[in-house]
């Protein structure tokens, strides 16, 4: 069953953002476009490259009214250390969301139960909290965040009133 055009299920978790721990909920995702980028775990091979890519494109996401959220099955404490020790991850100005209970990874269909990790998944959610795009692939395949930005631009164009 597809999750496209379904509402994000209720959740509450913690994130590391702008040097502090913050709570992130399904309500946090409302009122603006949200891009959830799921990664297997902190300190894994491709993740810093993808986070750096997202950081380099972050201003463009913000121009579209979108917030980026990186999600792994680690805790927000792990994300703090990751942010402080990895030059690439340290560029992130967006929340690094912990999902140690696998609430989000299960809700979005990216949980790998036998490993306790997430598949690489990217989801664009509208300001009402409805999932508009979903892309999931094997953890061996790194993503190009500029492609996600392109999708956000297309969605943004389609919803803007024509003047």
Write out the residue ranges for each language-model feature.
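Chalcogenol-based redox active-site neighborhoods
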Residues: 1-163
């Amino acid at each position: 069953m597809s999750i496209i055009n379904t509402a994000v299920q209720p959740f509450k978790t913690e994130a590391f953002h702008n040097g502090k721990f913050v709570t992130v909920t399904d309500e946090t995702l409302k009122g603006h476009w949200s891009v959830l980028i799921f990664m297997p775990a902190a300190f894994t091979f491709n993740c810093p490259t993808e986070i750096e890519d997202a950081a380099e494109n972050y201003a463009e996401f913000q121009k579209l009214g979108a917030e980026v959220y990186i999600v792994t099955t680690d805790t927000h404490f792990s994300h703090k250390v990751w942010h402080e020790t990895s030059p690439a991850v340290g560029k992130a100005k967006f929340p690094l969301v912990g999902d140690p209970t696998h609430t989000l990874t299960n809700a979005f269909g990216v949980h790998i139960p036998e490993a306790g990790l997430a598949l690489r998944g990217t989801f664009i959610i509208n300001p009402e909290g409805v999932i508009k795009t979903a892309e999931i692939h094997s953890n061996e395949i790194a993503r190009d965040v500029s492609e996600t930005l392109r999708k956000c631009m297309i969605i943004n164009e389609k919803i803007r009133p024509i003047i």
